[in-house]
């Protein structure tokens, strides 16, 4: 699950924990919750029969020096009653006083916020700042440590500082949408940055080339799709409904744009579709950013794309481009990645969906029918395919690592992909009666 849509997962484990048999499954497999999600997902078990075990499990991890367990632990708060109550639950499970538990959390949490709270900006190593913190505190770094921060940003292009030391971004936990967030955080001082743009504003007057951090982050993204053998064409939703926030300040549009640019960048440079993508619009057209930076590509994504989610128009555009390029069957995309909130235009005509009709034209032109991956960025309940539909995948969340798992299998249907995704986890089967839960 990672940094994806958490609410559904938390609702499910809360529901299971309130069932006698479901609670046994939760207790037996508690360790998978922070592994698949985050440590604070355990708070979904507060108020259930699994609460005590969850707090003890979390407290032990903190006492054992687990940094992520400490990072996501609730802090005491005078203004937030719920947070204070959760802090007390956790520190009681640890058997510690409030003062000692706060010290333990501080000792185990080496995060940039600690230095900022002490006004010790000079101690911050910007090459180690996580991507989310880089976007969140960009302006604070400029305000309190502009000289060192600018030196680091300028050195990013060369990869070394004036003393010859390596300079890089922290890519340990980095997703394409983080690069989008960093880009617009870096432009916030202009007064026409992310917040206005994501709600339909335009920011064409901004010099995107100055966003060195976002470009460096994008270049540092891992290759999540190596070895899959897939040629992916992103079809990205840019409609008004994509402005919805899906996690904190991250919008569905951030996810769509980040994934689209990432996938188009991973296609081989000798392929005619390298660094090309299609945004949904009334008149879809292929956008190329082959010789440009990530930040310039974002500007291209932003310029002039509004309106409908017309899948058929996008499919026709890809086919026309393939014919214009003289692309062979080994060059044309074999996977169409539709990144959307699934709020499509009316999709039926003569009992055939827009996608089916569009793909029939590909076959008529002599090309092999591609696989279709629907990536639901907003968690809406639109389902463009049934679970047994061949050559179709339904996925959601934020991480492109999902693609490698999806594209690596031979049986390409929603149910087969689900089963493949969970088969590596050795689930502990508790000793419960063999009857349905609920």
Outline where the language-model segments fall.
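Long lumenal/extracellular ectodomains of secretory and single-pass membrane proteins
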Residues: 1-255, 265-438
């Amino acid at each position: 699950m990672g940094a994806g849509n958490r609410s559904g997962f938390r609702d499910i484990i809360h529901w299971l924990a309130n069932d006698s048999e479901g609670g046994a499954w939760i207790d037996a497999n508690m360790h998978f919750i922070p592994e698949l999600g985050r440590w604070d997902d355990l708070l979904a078990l507060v108020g259930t029969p699994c609460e005590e075990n969850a707090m003890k499990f979390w407290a032990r991890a903190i006492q054992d020096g687990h940094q992520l367990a400490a990072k996501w632990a609730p802090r005491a708060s005078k203004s937030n009653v719920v947070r204070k109550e959760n802090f007390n639950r956790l520190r009681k499970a640890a058997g510690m006083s409030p003062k000692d538990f706060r010290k333990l959390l501080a000792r185990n949490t080496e995060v940039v916020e600690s230095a900022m709270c002490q006004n010790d900006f000079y101690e911050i190593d910007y090459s180690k700042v996580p991507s989310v913190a880089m976007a969140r505190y960009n302006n604070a770094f400029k305000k309190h440590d502009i000289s060192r921060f600018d030196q680091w940003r300028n050195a990013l292009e060369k990869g070394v500082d004036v003393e010859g030391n390596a300079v890089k971004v922290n890519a340990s936990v980095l997703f394409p949408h983080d690069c989008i967030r960093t880009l617009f955080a870096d432009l916030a001082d202009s007064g026409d940055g992310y917040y206005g743009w994501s709600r339909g504003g335009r920011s064409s007057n901004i010099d995107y080339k100055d966003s060195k951090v976002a470009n460096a982050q994008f270049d540092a993204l891992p290759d999540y799709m190596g070895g899959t053998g897939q040629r992916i064409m992103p079809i990205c939703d840019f409609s008004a409904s994509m402005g919805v926030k899906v996690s904190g300040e991250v919008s569905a549009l951030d996810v769509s744009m980040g994934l689209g640019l990432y996938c188009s960048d991973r296609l081989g440079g000798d392929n005619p579709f390298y660094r090309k993508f299609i945004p949904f619009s009334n008149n879809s057209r292929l956008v190329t950013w082959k010789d440009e930076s990530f930040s310039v590509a974002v500007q291209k994504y932003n310029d002039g794309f509004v309106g409908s989610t017309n899948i058929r128009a996008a499919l026709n555009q890809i086919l026309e481009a393939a014919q214009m390029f003289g692309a062979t069957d080994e060059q044309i995309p074999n996977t169409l990645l539709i990144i959307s909130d699934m709020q499509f235009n009316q999709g039926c005509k003569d009992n055939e969906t827009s996608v089916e009709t569009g793909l029939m034209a590909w076959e008529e032109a002599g090309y092999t029918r591609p696989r279709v991956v629907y990536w639901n960025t907003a968690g809406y309940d639109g389902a463009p395919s049934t679970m047994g539909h061949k050559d179709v995948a339904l996925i959601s969340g934020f991480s492109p690592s999902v693609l490698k798992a999806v594209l690596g299998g031979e049986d390409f249907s929603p149910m087969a992909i689900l089963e493949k995704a969970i088969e590596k986890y050795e689930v502990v089967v508790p000793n419960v009666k063999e009857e349905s839960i609920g």
